[in-house]
Amino acid sequence: MHRLTPLSLVFASLLSGIPAAAQDPGFARPNLVLKEGGTGMPRGDKQKVRVLTASFKPGERTVFHSHRSPVTVVILEGAFTLELEGRAPVTIAAGQACVEPPNVKMTGYNRSASEALKLVIFYVSDHQTPFLDPVH
């Protein structure tokens, strides 16, 4: 049996009016950027939602790390190259999004020599879970 969390109820109530409102002039209409199934979602009664921003100068990268829950990344400016252990690197451009899978070692780069990279990160986890686990 599926249980609705308070967060899912908020999203459901917001989305329920989209079709009607989208047809009326003067109302903004959301555009789907990413729709992806996933595993490793937190199951506890208390969850923490984090929305973070990050800016990378040309050539900067993240530490080698993993996450315990999926992480959604939306690219605002520049291009983000994601390297997941055992997989070919993937580059995500401005206006696109990706989901970083849980429990996979990874690093992310701004491979540009001249352009900055700006992104937004969405992370939902059990309350006490850290955002990332550095891999040494």
Regions found by a protein language model. Give the residues of each.
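Positively charged n-region of N-terminal signal peptides that target proteins for export
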Residues: 1-4
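Bacterial N-terminal signal peptides
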Residues: 6-17
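Sec/Tat signal peptide C-region and signal peptidase I cleavage site
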Residues: 18-22
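A short glycine-rich, His/Asp/Glu-containing loop-to-beta-strand
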Residues: 27-64, 122
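Glycine- and acidic-residue-biased ligand/ion/polar-headgroup-sensing regions
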Residues: 67-86, 96
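Short acidic-glycine-tyrosine-enriched beta hairpin
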Residues: 86-103
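Ligand-binding loop in jelly-roll beta-barrel domains
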Residues: 89, 103-128
